[in-house]
Design a protein with these regions (language model features):
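N-terminal subdomain of nucleotide-sugar transferases
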Residues: 1-63, 71-77, 106-226
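Active-site-proximal region of nucleotide-activated glycan assembly enzymes
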Residues: 129-139, 288-346
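Conserved catalytic-core segment of nucleotide-activated headgroup transferases in glycan assembly
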Residues: 182-191, 316, 327-410, 419
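Conserved active-site histidine-acidic residue motif and adjacent donor-binding/catalytic loop
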Residues: 251-254, 401-403, 417-430, 444
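Short acidic alpha-helix that forms the nucleotide-activated donor recognition element
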Residues: 258-262, 422-434, 453
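Acidic donor-binding loop of glycosyltransferase active sites
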Residues: 267-271, 431-444, 456
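A charged, aromatic-enriched C-terminal amphipathic alpha-helix characteristic of glycosyltransferases
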Residues: 349, 491-527
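Catalytic binding pocket for nucleotide-activated donors in carbohydrate/polymer assembly enzymes
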Residues: 439-508
Length: 533
């Protein structure tokens, strides 16, 4: 009993000490925890590290603006770039403190790293909840392209349009997985198939997944794209066989990428179509041919491609920023047709009992492969608010999560949040649920489109990929309206049934053959924009 009392007093005293931290003491503790996380030094473990991090998050949020700015100043000016990035990655990934994105971008841009680490640092920025300003990201991307060119020695003369193979298109993408329920994979395969079958192009596919782990002395918790090893593939898709070569970053060398770009040069395509590849490697063919970037999300791509294919305009301020950053060789094309959200039709059905889900609850799902980083602290509070306001609601998390689960396990709502892990058959799972909720993020458009096909209404904020895929019918203006709408879904059966039918109707209009219309418009506009040389 005395030992337990002593431990509790020690915890209370430690918490009292932390509440009185100065900005310098706060940063010192962050660094100590960061070093402990790396197992570089031994620090007495009076308080579990996760608890300490939660306290550090709270302390930072309660600092004055001037105190917070002083912490930013210290990290910006008192540390070498490598050390600053390690500290910043710990603050972002473990403390879940927002507002340090610009600091990371500055150190990435001004630091001196090898090509592959630079690519992966750019990738970390892309995965942040709040991506740094577009102009900074473009500067980092250009720097990475220059690094690749300098270290590979790639140099080819420009090929005039009249000398290109008019029947050949090369596709570069980030990932091709065996699971064709994986949205980017399905999108690439469907595009390649349609270009070949309906437009008679010879198609070659290349991948360049940014999937290398950053050194632990440089970044905590590397985020990247999953990929298979470097090898040739022949992919049977519908009634066609598609050729692909994978060049994942963790299994490739600079010589491999020189080989990849040389191979594309020798294929001499009409143009290179980048489908959602963030890697600067995908921009290297711009040296000798036209690169067309179809970013697959609503924002403008971070790319040196010649032509940007976009499907929607955002607010005027953002669009003006995009225009300012266009290089002299670049132009944007807006497609009137929406790229259809193709889904593999599944007749498989589940019961809630099979999934260990409660029979008597209104089940709202969160879906994604990066929910640990996409669900911000404020959105976690929103989830708790919904659970507090309506006891008939539970949440279902679909996708692999660790930190998010740990967070909710330490709340009063641990028994009302259920975790299904990665689910290859989303359509079948959705049929057991009631609502799809989208956190503020980039991505998620495909999973929301599948939800509509299952008749699952969607709730999302505007100006994001999910909003683009589900129409204004399912968007709300802010988080307050999001909560009100969710509560109405759970309590008003007439309202719910109306939206359920609207979801089914919208999905039925978004059939697979619409990809032909989309690609027809895209090809017409790309050919009009190709250089007249």
């Amino acid at each position: 009993m005395l030992n337990l009392l002593s431990q509790n007093l020690s915890l209370l005293y430690k918490e009292f000490q932390m509440l009185n931290y100065t900005p310098v003491e706060w940063l010192q503790t962050v660094i100590k925890n960061c070093m402990k996380n790396l197992h570089l030094t031994e620090i007495p473990n009076h308080v579990p590290l996760s608890d300490t991090n939660a306290q550090l998050h709270s302390i930072y949020e309660n600092f004055t603006t001037a105190e917070q700015q002083y912490i930013h100043h210290l990290i910006q000016n008192q540390f070498k770039h490598n050390d600053a990035l390690l500290i910043l990655s710990y603050i972002i990934n473990y403390l879940k403190v927002e507002g340090f994105e610009q600091d990371v971008a500055d150190h990435v841009y001004n630091g001196d790293f090898d090509c592959f680490n630079q690519i992966m640092l750019e990738t970390q920025l892309i995965f942040l909840n709040k991506v740094p300003p577009y102009n900074i990201m473009r500067k980092i991307h250009r720097k990475n392209i220059s690094c690749l060119l300098a270290n590979t020695g790639i140099s080819f003369p420009y090929i005039p349009l009249k000398d290109r193979n008019n029947n050949k298109i090369v596709i570069i993408t980030e990932q091709l997985l065996q699971n064709t329920n994986h949205a980017p994979t399905l999108m690439t395969l469907e595009t390649a198939y349609a270009l070949h079958k309906y437009f008679n192009y010879d198609i070659e596919i290349f991948t360049c997944a940014s999937n290398r782990l950053l050194p632990t002395y440089l970044w905590s918790l590397t985020t990247g794209f999953y990929s298979y090893d470097h090898h040739h593939l022949q992919i049977s898709y519908k009634d066609a066989v598609l050729n692909a070569i994978q060049y994942p970053l963790d299994a490739s060398t600079l010589n491999d990428y020189r080989e990849m770009i040389t191979y594309i040069h020798d294929l001499n395509p009409l143009f290179v179509l980048n489908i959602g590849a963030n890697s600067p490697i995908a921009d290297l063919p711009h040296l000798f041919t036209t690169v067309v970037n179809f970013n697959t999300v609503t924002t403008a791509p971070i790319s040196e491609a010649d032509i940007f294919i976009r499907c929607t305009k955002l607010d005027n301020a953002l669009e003006n920023l995009y225009k300012q950053e266009l290089s002299s060789h670049q132009q944007q094309i807006f497609i009137k047709q929406n790229f259809p959200a193709i889904t593999n039709i599944s007749n498989k059905s589940f019961t809630r009992k099979e999934l260990n889900l409660p029979e008597d609850k209104f089940l709202i799902c969160l879906v994604g492969n990066r929910l640990d980083t996409e669900v911000s602290p404020s959105f976690r509070q929103l989830i708790c608010s919904i659970l507090r306001l309506n006891s008939t609601i539970d949440f279902v998390v679909i996708g692999t999560v660790h930190e998010l689960k740990e967070h909710f396990e330490n709340t009063n709502y641990r028994d009302r949040i259920h975790y299904l892990g990665y689910c290859p058959d989303l359509l079948g799972i959705y049929r057991t649920l009631n609502l799809y909720l989208n956190p503020e993020r980039i991505g998620g458009g495909w999973s929301s489109a599948i939800a509509l096909r299952a008749g699952l209404p969607v709730v999302t904020l505007p100006n994001c990929d999910v909003a683009y895929n589900v129409s204004e019918t399912f968007t709300v203006t802010n988080e307050e309206q999001m909560i009100e709408t969710i509560l109405q879904y759970a309590s008003d059966k007439v309202f719910y049934n109306t939206k359920h039918q609207q979801a089914l109707d919208f999905a039925s209009q978004n059939e697979e053959n619409k990809i032909i219309d989309f690609l027809s418009e895209m090809l017409t506009k790309v050919k009009e924009a190709l250089p007249n040389d």
